[in-house]
Regions:
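A conserved acidic beta->alpha catalytic loop
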Residues: 83-96, 110
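Catalytic-site signature of metal-activated, phosphate-bearing donor transferases
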Residues: 2-35, 116, 143-293
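Short beta-strand-to-loop acidic/aromatic patch adjacent to the donor-nucleotide binding site
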Residues: 129-142
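Active-site beta-to-alpha loop of glycosyltransferases that engages the nucleotide-sugar donor
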Residues: 55-69, 85
Length: 293
């Protein structure tokens, strides 16, 4: 469906969460939605992967090893990586993981390609993955109460998606880039209830969703998404108190000042052509609490 028409139709729905869901369904297309529901009823393939992560990245090569190894150690089976015109050796850095069969790599050029990558991931991996997390290279999923992320997900079999809150980490005063791991370098984070931590990322059951709505929420086929405490979600994430006591996403949005300036130069895989403003650094450089060792 035409994007403008979809926005007009969705705009008349008063409840924000319902409106967002229908925005996603209309973007996916009503005929596609009907076709998908029929296909899901017929397809009983046993998923190959318990948990996969889908990410699109542009010139994030130096960060991949730590990010992949962290998530492998915490229960991720597979990574679907979409490379948005990287020229920093990303493909070569990922090669050992591609050879192991841990990374499924796609070169994904173009402008504003994040949602297109997520759509492609769902269409190609809907039946081979039990859960898919949609995340970025500056985000680390951290199970707090469980040993692994799948251990956490075992309590959510009845839900089509789980929304997990951020915990934003600042620069800690670091001006220059370093080869040390991100999670070791940046130990200072925001206050847990800071408004930025209301943002979420979703882990979805791909057989029960149509498509992503932006990078945070998903258009569900049925049922309600859950928060990390296992409660059905009835309010938009911007209206909810952040939860980080069971599981959280460490969000290293700025890293050091030098790395942020590199981020300004490369732009975002989500598609904006304008440079990331310095105001973003000032907003996300939150260093209120030092993480316990």
């Amino acid at each position: 469906m035409n994007k403008v028409l979809a926005e007009i139709i969705a705009g008349v729905i008063p409840h924000k969460m319902t409106r967002n869901r229908w925005r996603g369904i209309l973007r996916y297309g009503l005929f596609n939605a009907i076709r998908l529901k029929r296909e899901i009823k017929r397809n009983h393939t046993e998923p190959k992967f318990r948990l996969a992560v889908c990410a699109i990245a542009k010139n994030e090569g130096p960060y991949f090893k730590e990010w992949i190894e962290w998530h492998l150690a915490h229960g991720v089976d597979q990574f679907f990586i979409y490379d948005n015109e990287s020229n920093d050796g990303t493909r070569e850095i990922l090669e050992p993981y591609i050879e192991r069969g841990v990374v499924d790599y796609k070169y994904w050029p173009g402008y504003r390609m994040q949602l297109a990558a997520y759509d492609d991931c769902l269409e190609h991996h809907r039946f081979d993955s039990r859960w898919i997390a949609f995340s970025d290279l500056d985000e680390f999923i951290v199970p707090v109460k469980d040993a692994t992320i799948p251990d956490f997900l075992n309590r959510f079999e009845a839900f089509p998606a789980v929304e997990i809150n951020w915990l934003v980490y600042g620069s800690g005063g670091n001006k220059e880039k370093s080869n040390e791991d991100v999670m070791k370098r940046f130990r200072f984070h925001s206050l847990p209830d800071h408004y930025l931590n209301r943002h979420v990322k979703s882990i979805v059951n791909p057989r029960r969703v149509f498509t992503m709505i932006g990078c945070h929420e998903v258009a569900r086929i049925d049922g309600k998404a859950a928060d990390s405490h296992g409660n059905p979600i009835t309010r938009n994430f911007r209206e909810r108190t952040p939860q980080q006591d069971v599981i959280r996403i460490n969000h290293y949005a700025v890293r050091s000042l030098e790395e942020f300036r590199e981020k300004q130069l490369r732009g975002r895989a989500s598609g904006t052509k304008t440079s990331v403003p310095m105001d973003y650094f000032n907003e996300y450089d939150l260093n209120d609490i030092e993480e316990k060792q």
